[in-house]
Amino acid sequence: MSESFAQLFEESLKVLETRQGSIVSGTVVAIQKGFVLVDAGLKSESAIPVAEFLNAQGELEIQVGDTVNVALDAVEDGFGETKLSREKAVRHESWIELEKAYEEKATVIGLIXGKVKGGFTVELNGVRAFLPGSLVDTRPAREADHLLGKELEFKVIKLDQKRNNVVVSRRAVIESENSQEREQVLENLVEGSEVKGVVKNLTEYGAFVDLGGVDGLLHITDMAWKRVKHPSEIVNVGDEVTVKVLKFDKDRTRVSLGLKQLGQDPWAAIAENHPVNSKLTGKVTNLTDYGCFVEILDGVEGLVHVSEMDWTNKNIHPSKVVSLGDTVEVMVLEIDEERRRISLGLKQCKANPWTQFADTHNKGDKVTGKIKSITDFGIFIGLEGGIDGLVHLSDISWSISGEEAVRQYKKGDEVSAVVLAVDAVKERISLGIKQLEEDPFNNFVAINKKGAVVSATVVEADAKGAKVELAGGVEGYIRSADLTSEVAVGDVVEAKYTGVDRKSRIVHLSVKAKDQAEEAAAVASVNNKQEDIVIPNAMAEAFKAAKGE
């Protein structure tokens, strides 16, 4: 009973999590022109405009494989698709951060976007706040237009999410900055120097470190050389850390910090130490539909694309090959130092069945296998090593068309074939079934000399001529001009072999030429017999007189 209740409770939580307006976690599966495709594990993937993933500088903040929070606009819209919004999720997260900053009296970063009656509007990561003119500075300022477009620190002094009302103060920040400790820290800050601080706050994009009255931003991309999904993987609130000052804008009191810069960049000599085609051992750190990520060095992850996982199955799911945490051997296929990307291959560390086949088989060798599939263009036969060879329609039979011959076979049949060609690079093997027997056309040409009289059966006839079949299924043709009488399908005719068209594999025949040759031979035979007869003188003279000699 308790298990049933627990199950119902779990299902109710899932329903709540997928209600319209809820925030869900999704994975970036593709970045297309104008849209980012996100899979949140719902009914369908959702296309979100790229504009919702751009930062203030107009730069794309994500890449394929990243996990992002998105708001559920609709579980199913009018087209049966899930509709997600990154913009609403960012706004939701911003409200949470604003509430936290308000409670802890922490500073927030915002952009003074415009001037309104009584003050300015400030953009706080998707949330619009109001900055009263009296709270712009510690001293009354008649003209503060020079602040427009500037990114500054503020303190939240009023917050009402229901009414979408946020009031901030720049003066409060300035007043808190006017301390002796702060001045001392600012005086000693130098780009490139190492300083100590305490982690004050964590956000999705990084951590704020208190350097002693001055907050510095340790961005998530500067925490480690490897990919970091969330700052909590590296630091936690209250941690004392040593960081490097990357940038220091004294006028704006902006400090950018780095943690990974304290160590050596693992990408610095990666191409030299691990060139293309070299092999390494690494650990599987992430699985996606398009491949898996393998950490080959501390801080260096490479992608094994799904097409580089198995020699014979190009579309196999990565989870069928490796598991999270597996130690695997990979080969370096490509290195892009500028973009800090490395392409790896799993299958390249295993024997290549295509190369093995090429090494052990020559043109003309006989192979046997079962038919795996039959297509419009031929028959695929399974060979050793899990690879396939193709028998093209034109290589099935000498005597009948491929379309007719292929009907004699079915999936699962065991057949023999001859190796015609092997291309291990393109992973192609050409096979032939008809090559198991001698070519009847070539045999005919070799056995019969031009001028020989052969027997043929009429298979087609029209006004232009007759198509005939010779011994062994060889195709012949007799033009109507070379026929002495009408013929019908099934008639057997004797004809003279007059020529051959090797390209079309047709033997040309002539009944008329055969008959003419026979008549000429008969006349010659009669003349020869007449010359052999001895005629008496009287009769001879009479014979000559009759002939007018």
From Swiss-Prot:
Record GO terms (molecular function): mRNA binding; structural constituent of ribosome
Highest taxon of source: Bacteria
GO cellular component: cytosolic small ribosomal subunit
Organism listed in the record: Haemophilus influenzae (strain ATCC 51907 / DSM 11121 / KW20 / Rd)
Ranges for domain S1 motif: 21-87, 105-171, 192-260, 277-347, 364-434, 451-512
Pfam families recorded: S1
Protein role: Binds mRNA; thus facilitating recognition of the initiation point. It is needed to translate mRNA with a short Shine-Dalgarno (SD) purine-rich sequence.
UniProt-listed SUPFAM superfamilies: Nucleic acid-binding proteins (SSF50249)
GO biological process: translation
NCBIfam families in the cross-refs: PRK06299.1-1, PRK06299.1-2, PRK06299.1-4, rpsA
Full protein name: Small ribosomal subunit protein bS1
InterPro entries: NA-bd_OB-fold, Ribos_protein_bS1-like, Ribosomal_bS1, Ribosomal_protein_S1-like, S1_domain
Keywords: Repeat, Ribonucleoprotein, Ribosomal protein, RNA-binding
